A protein has these predicted regions:
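Active-site phosphate-binding/coordination module
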Residues: 1-41, 141
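Short beta-strand-loop/turn "lid" adjacent to the catalytic site in phosphate-handling enzymes
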Residues: 1-5, 31-35, 42, 66-89, ...
Length: 166
């Protein structure tokens, strides 16, 4: 099951948590908003008929793609994606027990956070994809766009206009 970034069904829940904004801001640098996936994960657990089990896996699109390419051998993400969940502490660079508890997200269900560069697994044989192809590098779309637009110098900036503007 998946809920995309534009989905606002958790707006009321984020409103209920308004008093927690200082904690969320301090841990994540984010505002409480349904754009981020923490409240969506909570929604799936509460309303989406997703049972908590030892095998539960909750992640972002990168972790889902890698998990599928490796047939479940690698369940990973990087900080650029984890930091957009409202569950990742950008100071400690780990999942936050406080934020996971606030949203009712079991920490065992979250992917391992790894470096953005480096090998994270290899493909398993599947329809049209041979086994053993290295999977290297993870980055969120806008973080990757920074490199794609050659912003390599301090002070460089970029702007992307599409379904969202960043």
């Amino acid at each position: 099951k998946a809920i995309v970034w534009q989905d606002r069904r958790t707006a009321d829940r984020c409103g209920e948590l308004a008093s927690e904004l200082p904690l969320v801001r301090a841990k994540t640098g984010l505002v409480l908003d349904p754009y981020f996936s923490g409240s969506k994960m909570e929604w799936l657990l509460v309303h989406g008929n997703v049972p908590v089990s030892p095998n539960l896996a909750l992640g972002t699109i990168d972790s889902w793609i890698i998990w599928n390419l490796t047939h479940g051998a690698s369940f990973v993400t990087d900080a650029s994606n984890a930091s957009r969940t409202m569950l990742f502490d950008i100071t400690t660079m780990h999942w936050s027990t406080e934020l996971c508890s606030m949203f009712g997200v079991p920490m065992h269900a979250l992917p391992t956070v790894v470096a953005s560069s480096g090998r994270v697994g290899e493909t398993a044989a599947s329809a049209g994809i041979p086994a053993g192809i290295p999977i290297s590098g993870i980055a969120g779309d806008q973080q990757a766009a920074l490199f794609g637009q050659a912003c390599f110098e301090t002070g460089s900036s970029k702007n992307t206009y599409g379904t969202g503007s960043f």
